[in-house]
């Protein structure tokens, strides 16, 4: 499934009926491969940056607290991960079938939980559950939804932090920070 060739496709808007199964197959293959050249350990750098961030709110503090509670369980660093898996980097055809992934600059060895942190924003929690079920059947380790939920909260905090510190990214809409703030309330209704 992974061949490194140029592919046609559009950014993920609406996944097709086979998309989740196709993504599970692709990620299982990638995570068992040896394509990465280095261990960048981006997950821990994001966490360290958030710890140092002076403007973090209680949502971020709580996410960091929960992350520290599972930190020892996230030390698996020998899976080859894409590292930036979100809608803009997932290509699909007209029927919503997975065509491939793009933007491989974050390719490294790391914990597979990190890979799943943002995808639920487009496939929903039920889609994530199905993806994890299909993925976990194919690998020798287990990715836990609870850990992915914590990492998703960390990713939301990180997205807000980088935009507040550096400004909006080139692909952002003008209300990007507001959208991430809303994501906290919609995705995590028990918070604030």
Region spans (language model):
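ATP-binding pocket architecture of kinase catalytic cores
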Residues: 1-38
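Structured catalytic cores of enzymes that bind and process phosphorylated ligands/cofactors
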Residues: 31, 78-80, 148
